[in-house]
């Protein structure tokens, strides 16, 4: 049957990408349908119970700046919060939280069920329908056809998923859930370029069988950080600690003894795993000189005894899993609640996507999450929001939301995917960004909220809070510039106490704050330096960073401006690169294959040299002259 209601946007999949995509589309006013094989697993944390970290926390803040759900759900479910790299530069400081799985899933479910313009329906999707080269809807397992002008596919690890434990394997999307075999086969029929990747998860341990007296405690930070601009510490549940143990030479010998039954080493697994989150057997094989690896025991929640041993993801046989776990200090009597496993799944070459995450071959079809070759909740959620928003923009025939590399980590992520592709699961790091001083956690809202508000992603209350913060920052920076001190105005002992030396000339608070050995708090101890208004910690942090890093930021802005012409210059859809004089055969082939949208994208394709970019620019200018 054909369902009687036609939707603007259909989202397939209810993981981190799918939930953000559906919420984004519905927030923008589009009639949206979220299809999932099981409503009970919406927003489920399939692997580790944590959100954020270096690079990933930056993505979460960007999501939040655009009205996304992940940061707020984390504030409602986080049972341990830490600020990483707190003593380092502002660019690499990041927030990470352990989340209660049950509370996190409940927070996402509540947002979904209370979101206007959003319908939920429980059915696996087995087919997509096309009208020529345009998407027109989907068909579910029981034959219901849902019509829509745009479809966002966020199938995660479910497309033709295969689970491995030792030499045993079976079809599945994750433990306990079926694979989307029919949909995977249908997408292959559409000739979309694809490959196989793999990821894995560790065995889970019953906390009642852990001897915590032998472990090192790792408490959260005090005061407790907050993840969302719409959140606060009062939202947080009870806070708990993580614990640290280590592998040892006995552990490593046990792991090696299972190599002959490892699906990774016996060729049973074809997919490539994540480089920066390798299985324990891969670590022992690659780093044979190391006698020990640190393992974090992370609580899964407040109402369960289950612990996640971060660092021993494995697909080794279950008897080896038991032995390796029990070889570690504090885990001698550990009971495993769930075995670790590896999962192989289909992904589609993201070089077949536009910067909007729409496929180049099928109009109105958008991909987000692990289907694009990424790994991680945060990477998936960020893509989901962007794809959901751009699906609405596509339906409305409006310009897509495109984020530049110097504007957002999400811009870096998408640009990397569509220009370089992936040969292993892609994870976000701060080192991937050329302009990371611009892309800090603390200024995500200043970079993105206005763009989100313009297209309806950001609500009125968040917009009001954003403007109050922005205006407070501007007022305080202006006040610092207009508050002056002379050597005669301050007592000599006060000058030495605050500045470490006597003032040699008149200076304002703005210039004084730029001194490397002086922070805002110390400066405010000067007589008459305190502002008349109460400023939040977030405003003070922004003010201090903007003042201290202004010189570096200005230099980066000059560099960005110098490249803007190249970055934004559009390439014609029908350009034939074999006719561009001077380009090598390799460059012509790659450009014709990948069809970059801008010269900037072309410049980042492997093998495209600066000389080739210069030839492209000449060709385009000649074309413009001929057109005139």
Swiss-Prot record:
Keyword Signal set for record: no
SMART domains associated with the record: GIDA_assoc_3
Keywords of this entry: Cytoplasm, FAD, Flavoprotein, NAD, tRNA processing
GO molecular function per UniProt: flavin adenine dinucleotide binding
Signal peptide range: none
Any single GO BP term: tRNA wobble uridine modification
Location of this chain's protein in the cell: Cytoplasm
Protein origin, superkingdom: Bacteria
Described function: NAD-binding protein involved in the addition of a carboxymethylaminomethyl (cmnm) group at the wobble position (U34) of certain tRNAs, forming tRNA-cmnm(5)s(2)U34.
UniProt xrefs under HAMAP family: MnmG_GidA
Assembly with partners or alone: Homodimer. Heterotetramer of two MnmE and two MnmG subunits.
Designated name of the protein: tRNA uridine 5-carboxymethylaminomethyl modification enzyme MnmG
Provenance organism: Neisseria meningitidis serogroup C (strain 053442)
UniProt gene name: mnmG
